[in-house]
Amino acid sequence: MGEVNIAPLGDRIIVKPIEREVMKSGIIIPDTAKEKPMEGEVVAAGPGKLGEKGERAPMDVKKGDKVLYGKYSGTEVKINDKNYLIMHQDDVLGIIK
């Protein structure tokens, strides 16, 4: 699977948060003052939500997409000593083009 060895189920995705260490002004933000990142990259996506008749709804996001998500979205997990979020596709606010 590449970066992660977990396959998300249903409409879940695994997102690698993109940390913003330095502000545009060049000020470095200490860890204690950082807010949770709200931008990330999808590193794995499930097959889609299973419908009542057994059909799969197609996923709107795919591996490699840069996404915006809510500040408190998802469940934080550590995989191979890196932090990721597992969330439902519905937690994604938009895809960055």
UniProtKB/Swiss-Prot annotation:
Q: Which SUPFAM superfamilies match?
A: GroES-like
Which cellular compartments is it found in? Cytoplasm
Gene Ontology CC annotations of this record = cytoplasm
Asked if Chaperone is a keyword of the record, the answer is yes
Q: Which InterPro entries match?
A: Chaperonin_GroES, Chaperonin_GroES_sf, Chaprnonin_Cpn10_CS, GroES-like_sf
**Predominant localisation class:** cytoplasm
Q: Name one GO biological process term.
A: chaperone cofactor-dependent protein refolding
Entry's Gene Ontology molecular function annotations: ATP binding; metal ion binding; protein folding chaperone; protein-folding chaperone binding; unfolded protein binding
* Keywords of the record: Chaperone, Cytoplasm
Span of the secretion signal? none
Q: How does it assemble?
A: Heptamer of 7 subunits arranged in a ring. Interacts with the chaperonin GroEL.
Known role: Together with the chaperonin GroEL, plays an essential role in assisting protein folding. The GroEL-GroES system forms a nano-cage that allows encapsulation of the non-native substrate proteins and provides a physical environment optimized to promote and accelerate protein folding. GroES binds to the apical surface of the GroEL ring, thereby capping the opening of the GroEL channel.
Name the family the entry cites. Belongs to the GroES chaperonin family.
HAMAP family xref list: CH10
The protein depicted here goes by the name Co-chaperonin GroES
Q: Which gene encodes it?
A: groES
